[in-house]
Regions:
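A short, surface-exposed helix-loop junction/capping segment
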Residues: 81-88, 297-300, 349
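Short amphipathic alpha-helical segments
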Residues: 84, 93-101, 108, 235, ...
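Short secondary-structure junctions and interdomain/linker hinges
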Residues: 28-32, 39, 95-100, 108-115, ...
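Short, well-ordered alpha-helical packing segments
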Residues: 89, 105, 240, 244-247, ...
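Extended, helix-rich architectural segments
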Residues: 1-136, 140, 485-494
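C-terminal helix-loop subdomains that flank or include functional centers
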Residues: 277-293, 310, 317-494
Length: 494
């Protein structure tokens, strides 16, 4: 994210906006060179040391999967908005919002920032969402105490023919303010002077370069991973390098066994002919040499003084430090090899859960911003069926962790028995209940159906009691009929 000394009024002038875009583009490319490219290199296994074990990818992927692999649920305190929010949750699922948000979270876990574009196509009744590449995207803010977004941009690199012998590479830039989307370009990738992408020859060319939108805010929303805007593995880059350096040396040590140097002490080899014979004996794994003045012959290979056990102990120590500092545990370790109670599991995952809670606090405001843009768009197209009061929204995250549902069900039953259970809140705590609103409504319908069946059975039993008792001959006829059925079935079976 980039801060510029400008205001929302400045960007209404195209010339000022273009100059700000040029400054922002230069700053962005500098951020990519100095930081973000390195973050993605570590994630892809291209760090300072050859990555025998890609710890950065494990940390970034695992933390993001814990945090946002299950999309957050939106609910409301207002009963009159409940139906609209339920419809929005379903619509967001159909629009692939969960996948887009997961990709945003993945980028934020890697480099500290992720970007989500809210957009629409012609005649859309509901917005669409896509995650943008941080290496080609950024959002610019003013310098207020509470910075507000001025504009966002994303760009692609393109090539054009200058003549039959020469090509020109340039950036095509999409710039979004709170009112318009601009289509711009640079002269080249080295000359970042900005101007309109389409030549303005006709009146309609202006609309191709400057298209209005109706989200009421800059449609690119920045999602911070933490207050420092760093990735989850950033704090352990040095340890990752040390870990992989030792791993690389250990592998080289094994490969070099065949090239070990033989050290001979107090041995007379002799002339060239005797030396050739000595080498031949070595090839046959035999050593024969003359002792010098009875001083004692000694022969040994020069090897690394560190044994494989010593190296593995050092690797385990560094690995433990990596997972402790990054707060992302190693789930393949012995600590997670046995079944544990819910409390014991939470203690092991305390740092992991704290990391997820920090991400929640950073994502909350960005998600509320996206919901406001959705609401603005729905109000503009007068789709009242989906509109809602954003200030009353509650965001519920479900962390993708192993859980002891048996203990949780016991607690829920105990609360229900003493009359202190909120059914919906109880359902939220169960990992296997994905859509607690739908589950709750279906459960209510099932209870009503069961009650109806029980009531009908009671009525049937009451009616039977009111019927006149059967006479003896009627009972005899019924008994004979039953016996006849039984004997008939026996004959058929024979």
């Amino acid at each position: 994210m980039i801060q510029l000394n400008a205001s929302v009024y400045d960007i209404e002038d195209d010339k000022i906006l273009f100059s700000l875009v040029e400054r922002a583009l230069n700053k962005h490319l500098e951020i990519v060179r100095n930081k973000w490219q390195r973050d993605f290199d570590y994630y892809n296994g291209v760090g300072k040391e050859p990555h025998q074990t890609n710890k950065a990818k494990y940390i970034d992927d695992m933390s993001n999967s814990l945090f946002i692999s299950i999309p957050p649920e939106f609910s409301t305190f207002n009963t009159y908005d409940t139906e609209a929010i339920s419809k929005n949750n379903k619509k967001l699922k159909l629009r692939g919002f969960g996948k887009a948000l997961y990709d945003v979270g993945s980028n934020a876990s890697i480099c500290g920032s992720g970007f989500l574009l809210t957009y629409n196509k012609d005649s859309d009744e509901y917005p669409r969402f896509v995650s943008l590449d941080p290496l080609r995207t950024n959002v610019c803010f003013n310098c207020d105490v509470e910075p507000d977004s001025l504009f966002g941009f994303t760009f692609v690199q393109q090539v054009e023919k200058v003549n039959s012998y020469e090509d020109n590479t340039y950036y095509k830039i999409y710039v979004y303010t709170d009112k318009y989307m601009y289509t711009l370009r640079t002269i080249s990738t080295k000359n970042l002077n900005v101007f309109y992408y389409y030549p303005i020859k006709l009146e309609e060319d202006i609309l191709r370069n400057k298209t209005p939108h109706y989200f009421g805010k800059v449609p690119i929303t920045a999602f911070k991973n933490n207050d420092n805007e760093t990735g989850d593995s950033y704090c352990v880059y040095g340890l990752i390098d040390a870990y992989n350096h030792i791993r690389e040396d250990a592998i080289k040590n094994i490969d070099d066994v065949i090239d070990y140097i033989l050290f001979l002490k107090n041995v007379r080899i002799g002339n060239d002919e005797e030396l050739k014979m000595f080498k031949k004996l070595l090839d046959e794994h035999i050593i024969a040499a003359e002792d010098i003045d009875g001083k004692g012959v000694d022969a040994k290979f020069l090897t690394n003084p560190l044994s494989q056990n010593d190296i593995q102990t050092m690797l385990d120590s560094i690995s433990n430090d990596i997972h402790t500092i990054s707060r992302v545990p190693n789930f393949s370790s012995e600590a997670f090899a046995q079944n544990a109670s819910s409390i014991a599991l939470q203690l092991k995952l305390l740092g992991f859960l704290n990391l997820a809670n920090e991400k929640e606090r950073c994502f909350d405001q960005s998600l509320i911003r996206v919901l406001k843009m959705i609401n603005n768009y729905l109000k503009f197209i007068k789709n009242d069926e989906y509109t809602f009061e954003v200030d009353d929204i509650e965001i519920t995250y479900t962390h993708n962790l192993p859980s002891n549902d048996t203990e949780m069900v016991t607690q829920i039953v105990n609360l229900s028995n003493v009359g202190l259970l909120d059914a919906k809140e109880g359902l939220k705590q169960l990992s296997w209940v994905k859509d607690y609103e739908t589950f709750y409504e279906n459960a209510k319908k099932e209870q009503e159906m069961q009650k109806l069946v029980v009531d009908n059975l009671k009525k049937f039993n009451n009616n039977e009691r009111e019927v006149e008792p059967m006479r003896k001959e009627q009972m005899d006829n019924l008994q004979n009929f039953s016996q006849g059925l039984t004997s008939n079935n026996d004959n058929q079976s024979q």
